[in-house]
Amino acid sequence: MALTESRRLYQQLAAELKQRIENGVYPVGDKLPAERNISEEMNVSRTVVREAIIMLEVEGYVEVRKGSGIHVISNQQRHLLAANGSDADFLTAGPFELLQARQLIESNIAEFAATQVTRQDIIQLMEIQENARQEDRFRDSEWDLKFHVQVALATQNSAMATIVEKMWSQRIHNPYWRKLHEHIDDKSIESWCEDHDQILKALIRKDPYAAKLAMWQHLENTKQMLFRATTDDFEFNVDRYMFAENPVVHLDHITNGKL
């Protein structure tokens, strides 16, 4: 199957899989082929396959059952998605596209914040972390959002905070991210608070390289957790569609173990 660039790859793949389901190639009650096989047949990455499957889940065609596979539960779309207004592009973006964008942008924001952060910024970040720990759950916590926005505010540039808040809010409004998030357990989410501690420590030291690495690693951990939570058929070493190695990822060589 040759996928063109007129639409996002995961949308093209989802359309092909939906057509097969509707035509009875994959009947209701059966399972889709393993993600590995879909990836090889369609000549796309595993990330693209995962996003396409999430889209099919949201629209009601399939159900992903951990340890069991991808089950076809309907041969017609059950849920219609509305993507209107200024956020339409965000609403149709794949969850891993959004995560990659956040990783690239927020790691650089954290780096700059370390050069501009004030004592008051540090106090506010410490208070946010304290409040986060007092909650009985960290899933969709307001303190998670506040932490990321406060890091951006520490740049002393309000536009940075607006960008971060708008991107972060897609975790609530993007239907594909919400579906993906349902598969994550609360214990895994608690590790995000520990990641925030590492970012805060770097900001306290006013170490831009360490702050950039800590934010990058935080979102890298999130990506790995999301993959582990939603598939039994994933080998990151063979997936170079997104999060491929580039100069940003090599910060660990620059910091020489400062974190």
From Swiss-Prot:
<dbReference type="InterPro" id="IPR036388">
    <property type="entry name" value="WH-like_DNA-bd_sf"/>
</dbReference>
<dbReference type="InterPro" id="IPR008920">
    <property type="entry name" value="TF_FadR/GntR_C"/>
</dbReference>
<dbReference type="GO" id="GO:0003677">
    <property type="term" value="F:DNA binding"/>
</dbReference>
<dbReference type="InterPro" id="IPR011711">
    <property type="entry name" value="GntR_C"/>
</dbReference>
<protein>
    <recommendedName>
        <fullName>Exu regulon transcriptional regulator</fullName>
    </recommendedName>
</protein>
<feature type="domain" description="HTH gntR-type">
    <location>
        <begin position="7"/>
        <end position="75"/>
    </location>
</feature>
<keyword id="KW-0238">DNA-binding</keyword>
<dbReference type="GO" id="GO:0005737">
    <property type="term" value="C:cytoplasm"/>
</dbReference>
<comment type="function">
    <text>Major regulator of exuT transcription.</text>
</comment>
<dbReference type="Pfam" id="PF00392">
    <property type="entry name" value="GntR"/>
</dbReference>
<keyword id="KW-0804">Transcription</keyword>
<keyword id="KW-0805">Transcription regulation</keyword>
<dbReference type="GO" id="GO:0003700">
    <property type="term" value="F:DNA-binding transcription factor activity"/>
</dbReference>
<dbReference type="InterPro" id="IPR000524">
    <property type="entry name" value="Tscrpt_reg_HTH_GntR"/>
</dbReference>
<keyword id="KW-0963">Cytoplasm</keyword>
<keyword id="KW-0678">Repressor</keyword>
<feature type="DNA-binding region" description="H-T-H motif">
    <location>
        <begin position="35"/>
        <end position="54"/>
    </location>
</feature>
<dbReference type="Pfam" id="PF07729">
    <property type="entry name" value="FCD"/>
</dbReference>
<dbReference type="InterPro" id="IPR036390">
    <property type="entry name" value="WH_DNA-bd_sf"/>
</dbReference>
